Structure formats: structure tokens, C-alpha cells
Swiss-Prot record:
GO BP annotations listed: dentate gyrus development; membraneless organelle assembly; mRNA destabilization; muscle organ development; negative regulation of inflammatory response; negative regulation of long-term synaptic potentiation; negative regulation of translation; negative regulation of tumor necrosis factor production
The Agenet-like domain, residue ranges: 4-50, 63-115
Annotated organism of origin: Xenopus tropicalis
Name this polypeptide is given: RNA-binding protein fxr1
Gene name for this UniProt entry: fxr1
InterPro entries listed in its UniProt record: Agenet-like_dom, FMR1, FMR1-like_C_core, FMRP_KH0, FXR1_C1, FXR_C3, KH_dom, KH_dom_type_1
Length: 674
């Protein structure tokens, strides 16, 4: 600001040093040295330029000079007009001209100068230029040090930013300054913007340096994430990084995208580890036995999806046989999981537990199969064997007995046609297919031949009663399935289905009866129509039946009596009272291995008995059975104990085959008379 120095005349005639701040039409805005007076506007005629600094000081007696002095202690020094009266060495005696009274003073040569010959300034004494400043540069332009080089280049006396007009003011006493300002103004503003950006970067670098110094002494961890997993680590729009930065105690998180390196700084080790758990994504694999892959995946991927959801992994992939990226063990299939380290640990726990569970289930199933095989080999037991072809055809969570029942698997034993599904095991006391061991191969052949010759109506009548039999076996009791002692009344559900294959086979199960909850062996007391609830399995030509051998003789008996099936079918009497004649041995009891062994021994003893007494015993038993159907109905091979006080109605009883090895013909029983 020394270049803008002027001298302002005071009220006492002395000139005081000041600085021009702005130029107006007829005045100047002047700031006084040391601010001894406030800033004010001074007319041009009271302001003059100071003399040139290189002027020679040649002072003699009688010259008019200016003395640098002050009138009192409250005012600063100024240039007062005086006249030299006498000289003596370095000292001068001067007389002030501005004072009314004569005032002399002795001063040194340094306080004297020749009189200032400059006249008062005018409007043309100063040149003023303005430059508009962009908004982003207004703040930096307010610092006058920014314009230091620009001021020197244009030769200006002063350059400053005017906040009210948002302009850069350039003041100069030279006319050439105006042209230079026009040329350099744009360049000056660009340089300010560049310097501002560099200064900002330097400030950020300084702050980063200070922060790094602080973080160096704090907790930090560094880890690398694979390039293909970097997107998962960063998250959508950097969500994972933001979540990690919100962890209390985290001061900074740095990411080097080129190398995939994360650096986490925090105030505590716990905070750093927690933030790392959000960002560290890895890929790991778990070996799964090949035979358990399907069960680990589950139906429609339900099991593996549950494992993925609970563990929190991002995705799972099963390594193919043609892929050799991962090490593979014999009989194992790698499951590749992608996620955070915590989620990978969770999926390992879940998968290892599930595989252990599947192995235990497989072990139990194999033990079950071994037990069933032993039962079949020991005593022709009625335990069912699984007819499912391969392990892949069943779900691993399916119960063995239920699956066997659905598929209608056959029992291990080989005699008789009264076998049901696996749910109809020998859980009904002594009603097993081993209860009557007297049937021989010759009887089976005769039954098969008689069955093929029997009339269709009589087959239906016989089959209908068979459908009502309770599952259990081939015993003589009325509740036996399709054994020798089974009833022959009613129509067969199997025959009706064979007649009309397009009909609904489940319509046979529609009828119910009041005594449905009675004992299993009391099922013979139900009506013929309700006997369809439990139909037998479909017979083949190779299967033989006791009823087959009775078909011809029964048809003949009906024709001899002249009875028609549709006319003489009296209402059947409710025979549920028969259950009171049943022994306790026929109650349902769980079958054990000892039962199978005892039945096998009993069968072997009974096979040694003569065939003829057994045949006679059968005839005597049949005579005691009460049958309330017409002549076309067959007597059920039911309980031997019947009520003696009830009158016998005309009926057709069941004829029994004599199991003779010489192939003797069967005798028919008609109306209770052989």
C-alpha cells in the first residue's frame, strides 16, 4: 500500500500521510496511518502526491522547507511548512510559517526536506479498473496476497476485492495499467482457481497425514478380498462399507480397488473385527457323500434352501463331475458356498449335522432290513419286505411301513392269498396266515380250477364278503383276510372293479356301519354292502384260494334247490354276538420274533397230522355256522362256537375241501347237510 500513499492536508495546514482506498468522482477514500483518524472521503484539492523518494536534499539558509513535526502529543507527525533561519553543522534553526506567532525550533537534517512542489490531485491523477469475479472465486479473492503477482505484473498501485459489488478493483497512477488488466484478468482468475484446487488438495493431504499418524497408533486390520467377490464385499451402492463404518469405534476404512485390499482402523479390537465380518467375503467348499447328495438337496431344493437361509450364505454351487478346480475325494461331491466367514462357519455346522443325521437314518434303515431278512429266513414270518426297487425312489424322510403300505408290497410268507400290505402285519393275535397249516398244494390246484369254472354271480357274492374281512392272515376266525376260514357272502370288491375298470375304486369305502369299532374278528357281522370297505388285493391266475374249490358245488346246490339269487336272499342277521365266543387269544397283540418262531414250530407239527381227520374237523365246524343269506350265499368259515338256542334258517353253508394227497373231490354242504 506504500504505492498508494498520499498526503492529506489537515485543518492546521500540515500534511499527514494517508493511503488511497478508492477513487470517486470528486474525492478520494483515504485511510490514515496508524488509524489515528477514521477512514473518510477527502476532496481532491486537499490531497497531493508525496515527493519522489530519490530527490536530493540541498538546503541553505533562507530556503523554504518542510519539517516533520507535530503540534502536540495527541497528534501524529506531519509535514509543516517552515523557513531556515540559520545553519550550524548538522543543526538547523527553522521558523514555522503556519503559526500565527513566530515559533522557532532547532531540528536535525533528517527531519527536513525541500518543499513539496506537487499540486493537488485530480480525477485524472488515478486510473481505476474493475473485473467481475465468479462466485466460486469470491472467497479466495478477498485475500490480497492472492493478487500480489497480478498487481506487480500490471503495475497497479492497489488490487483488492470489493464485497458489495463482487468485483476486483485495480487502482493505478499509470494509464498502461488499464490495458494490462484487460489482457491478464482472465488468466489471473484461472490461476486463482488452479491454486485454490491445489491448496485444497494440500489441506486434505495434510489432514490425511495427521489422521494416518493417529491411526498408526490405533487398532487396525488388513485383508484381501478376491476380485470376483469385491462386488459382494462393497455391497449395493457401498451398503456394506457404510454399515461397517457405522460400527461404534471405527475411525476409518480404506479400500485399494486395484489389489482388493481393505484396511480397517478403529479404537478397539472388537470394533475392528466386527467391521471386518461385514466386508470379508470368501468361498469355501464342503465334501458331501455322493449317495446323500439328493437328500441334502431335498425335494425341489427345500433342504439346501433352508440351510442357505439359516446360515446367511450368498449362494451355493454343486461341483460337477467334469470340473476339477477343487480337490475331490472318492465318493464325495463338493458343495461350494460363498459368503462371509461367519456365514461359511454357520453352513458348515448345519451341513455336517444334517449329513450325520442322514447317516444315522441310513444305518437304522439297514438294521431294519437285516431284522426283516432274519425274520423271513427263520419262520416265514409275516413281516413285510420293502418292494421299492432302489433307494432313489423314496424320500429319505418317508416312514418304512408307510411307504410299503402305499406300494402294496407283499409279505415274506408264501402260503395262502390272505396277505395284505405291510400295515396288516400279524398284529391281531392268532389271526395269522400260519393259523391253518392244513392246506396242501393239491387243494390249491383244485381251488384254482374251481374258481375258473365258477359263475360270475357267485364269484361276486364270494368276493363281496371277502372285502369285509379284517386284515390279519388266513386263520379260521371270521376276521381273517382271504384265508381258508374266510366268509363267502356278498359281492367281491375286486370283481366289481374288474368288471368296470373305469369306475371309482374308492367308492367301495363309502359305506359305514354302527359297529365299525368292534373287535377285529367281529367284522363278519356287517352287511354285505359294507363288506366292500376292506377289499382284497387283486388276484392273479397263479394265486390259489380256498373259495375257488367251492364254486362249482355251490352253483350246483343252488340249481338243485331251484333257488334264484335275486329272489331268496334273506336279510342277514347281525352276528356281532359271535365275538363273545371268541377267545382272548384273538385280541390284537403286537407280534414279536418269538411269535414267528412259535408259529413256525406249530406249523411244522400240524403238517405231520393226517389230512383226513383235518378235513372231517372242517366239516363239523362248518355245520355250526349260521348263515342267513339265500342259497347262493356261502357260509363263512367263522367261529366254531354258535348259539344253540337259535333256529337255523334255510341257507347254503360253505363246503370244505378235503386235503387228501390222492386228489379226492370236494364234498358240497347244502343247507347244513353234507
Amino acid at each position: 500500500m506504500e504505492d498508494l500513499a498520499v498526503e492529506v492536508r489537515g485543518s492546521n495546514g500540515a500534511y499527514y500521510k494517508g493511503f488511497v482506498k478508492d477513487v470517486h468522482e470528486d474525492s478520494l477514500t483515504v485511510v490514515f496511518e496508524n488509524n489515528w483518524q477514521p477512514e473518510r472521503q477527502v476532496p481532491f484539492h486537499e490531497v497531493r502526491m508525496p515527493p519522489l523518494p530519490d530527490i536530493k536534499k540541498e538546503i541553505t539558509e533562507g530556503d523554504e522547507v518542510e519539517v516533520y513535526s507535530r503540534a502536540n502529543d495527541q497528534e501524529p507527525c506531519g509535514w509543516w511548512l517552515a523557513k531556515v533561519r540559520m545553519m550550524k553543522g548538522e543543526f538547523y534553526v527553522i521558523e514555522y510559517a503556519a503559526c500565527d506567532a513566530t515559533y522557532n525550533e532547532i531540528v536535525t537534517f533528517e527531519r527536513l526536506r525541500p518543499g513539496n512542489q506537487n499540486k493537488s490531485v485530480t480525477k485524472s491523477s488515478f486510473f481505476k479498473c474493475t473485473v467481475d469475479v465468479p462466485e466460486d472465486l469470491r472467497e479466495p479473492c478477498s485475500n490480497e496476497n492472492v493478487h500480489k503477482e497480478f498487481k506487480k505484473a500490471v503495475g497497479a498501485c492497489r488490487v483488492y476485492f470489493h464485497a458489495e459489488t463482487n468485483q476486483l478493483i485495480i487502482l493505478s497512477a499509470c494509464e498502461s495499467t488499464v490495458k494490462r488488466v484487460t489482457i491478464l484478468s482472465d488468466m489471473h482468475l484461472r490461476s486463482i482457481r488452479t491454486k485454490l484446487m491445489l491448496m485444497s488438495r494440500n489441506e486434505e493431504a495434510t489432514k490425511h497425514l495427521e489422521c494416518t499418524k493417529q491411526l498408526a497408533a490405533a487398532f487396525h486390520e488388513e485383508f484381501v478380498v478376491r476380485e470376483d467377490l469385491m462386488g459382494l464385499a462393497i455391497g449395493t451402492h457401498g451398503s456394506n462399507i457404510q454399515q461397517a463404518r457405522k460400527v461404534p469405534g471405527i475411525t476409518a476404512i480404506e479400500l485399494d480397488e486395484d489389489s482388493g485390499t481393505f484396511r480397517i482402523y478403529g479404537e478397539s479390537a472388537e470394533a475392528v473385527k466386527k467391521a471386518r465380518s461385514y466386508l470379508e467375503f470368501v468361498e469355501d467348499f464342503i465334501q458331501v457323500p455322493r449317495n446323500l447328495v439328493g437328500k441334502v438337496i431335498g425335494k425341489n431344493g427345500k433342504v439346501i434352501q433352508e440351510i442357505v437361509d439359516k446360515s446367511g450364505v450368498v449362494r451355493v454351487r454343486i461341483e460337477g463331475d467334469n470340473e476339477t478346480k477343487l480337490p475331490r475325494e472318492d465318493g464325495m461331491v463338493p458343495f461350494v458356498f460363498v459368503g462371509t466367514k461367519e456365514s461359511i462357519g454357520n453352513v458348515q455346522v448345519l451341513l455336517e449335522y444334517h449329513i450325520a443325521y442322514l447317516k444315522e437314518v441310513e444305518q437304522l434303515r439297514m438294521e431294519r432290513l437285516q431284522i426283516d431278512e432274519q425274520l423271513r429266513q427263520i419262520g416265514m414270518g409275516f413281516r413285510p419286505s420293502s418292494s421299492r426297487g432302489t433307494e432313489k425312489e423314496k424320500g429319505y424322510a418317508t416312514d418304512e411301513s408307510t411307504a410299503s403300505s402305499v406300494r402294496g408290497s407283499r409279505s415274506y410268507s408264501g402260503r395262502g392269498r390272505g396277505r395284505r400290505g405291510p400295515n396288516y402285519t400279524s398284529g391281531y393275535g392268532t389271526n395269522s396266515e400260519l393259523s391253518n397249516p392244513s392246506e396242501t398244494e393239491s387243494e390249491r390246484k383244485e381251488e384254482l380250477s374251481d374258481w375258473s369254472l365258477a359263475g360270475e354271480d357267485e364269484r361276486e357274492s364270494r368276493q363281496q364278503r371277502d372285502s369285509r374281512r379284517r386284515p390279519g392272515g388266513r386263520g379260521r376266525s371270521g376276521s381273517a383276510g382271504r384265508g381258508r376260514g374266510g366268509s363267502r357272502g356278498g359281492k367281491s370288491s375286486i370283481s366289481s372293479v374288474l368288471k368296470d375298470p373305469d369306475s371309482n375304486p374308492y367308492s367301495l369305502l363309502d359305506n359305514t356301519e354302527s359297529d365299525q369299532t368292534a373287535d377285529t374278528d367281529a367284522s363278519e357281522s356287517h352287511h354285505n354292502t359294507n363288506r366292500r370297505r376292506r377289499s382284497r388285493r387283486r388276484r392273479t391266475d397263479e394265486d390259489s384260494s380256498l373259495m375257488d374249490g367251492m364254486t362249482e358245488s355251490d352253483n350246483a346246490s343252488v340249481n338243485e334247490n331251484g333257488l334264484d339269487d335275486s329272489e331268496q336272499k334273506p336279510q342277514r342277521r347281525n352276528r356281532s354276538r359271535r365275538r363273545r365266543f371268541r377267545g382272548q387269544a384273538e385280541d390284537r397283540q403286537p407280534v414279536t420274533v418269538a411269535d414267528y418262531i412259535s408259529r413256525a414250530e406249530s406249523q411244522s407239527r400240524q403238517r405231520n397230522l393226517p389230512k383226513e381227520p383235518l378235513a372231517k374237523g372242517k366239516k363239523e365246524k362248518v355245520k355250526d355256522v349260521i348263515e342267513e343269506h339265500g342259497p347262493s350265499e356261502k357260509v363263512i368259515n367263522g367261529p366254531r362256537a354258535a348259539s344253540a338256542d337259535k333256529a337255523l334258517k334255510p341257507q347254503t353253508t360253505e363246503r370244505n375241501k378235503a386235503s387228501c394227497q390222492d386228489g379226492s373231490k370236494q364234498e358240497a354242504i347244502l343247507n347244513g347237510v353234507s
